[in-house]
A protein has these predicted regions:
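Gram-negative bacterial Sec-dependent N-terminal signal peptides
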Residues: 1-26
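Mobile, glycine-rich extracellular loop/lid and propeptide segments
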Residues: 28-148
Length: 148
């Protein structure tokens, strides 16, 4: 007997139930209205906030800026008037920010250390770094990691 991962079985079962009409259609669910309150300019026309995370304790958004290789920090304690309050330069740790996440009292960014290619032009995996900093942008540590 062929074994399927649990997630595959769940998806197949849910699909079958939807087809059979046994699950409520999304149209029957309560609707959610989203209203824009404000927007934040992420740069001077160069770079953009590709990946962002929110830290509730500091009321700040931390966003990757791949062009500048930084994590930009935005204070949204006054939601109607957000402002950029700083950035963390990641060039000392690597050359390509790939992710950011916030939790407790720290923020973690992941960076590639170098872009390496084989003789045939195929990208090769190199060790990367994680950069741990506080919500004010002060770097606390930067241990090596594998497979970034």
């Amino acid at each position: 007997m062929k074994k399927f991962p649990l997630i595959a079985i769940t998806v197949i079962t849910a699909s079958a139930l939807i087809t059979a009409g046994q699950l409520p259609a999304l149209a029957n669910e309560a609707t959610m209205k989203i209203t824009e309150i404000t927007s934040i300019a992420s740069g001077d026309g160069e770079g953009s906030a590709e990946i962002a995370t929110y830290h509730a304790g500091s009321k700040r958004i931390f966003a990757t800026n791949g062009v500048k290789n930084t994590i930009d920090i935005f204070d949204i304690s006054d939601v109607a008037n957000p402002k950029k309050v700083g950035s963390v330069a990641l060039s000392p740790y690597g050359n390509d920010v790939t992710s950011v996440a916030a939790g407790r009292d720290v923020v973690v960014a992941v960076v590639n250390v170098s872009d390496k290619f084989s003789a045939t032009g195929v990208p090769t995996t190199t060790n990367g770094k994680i950069v741990v900093f506080d919500t004010a942008g002060k770097v606390l540590s930067s241990p090596d990691v594998l497979g970034v």
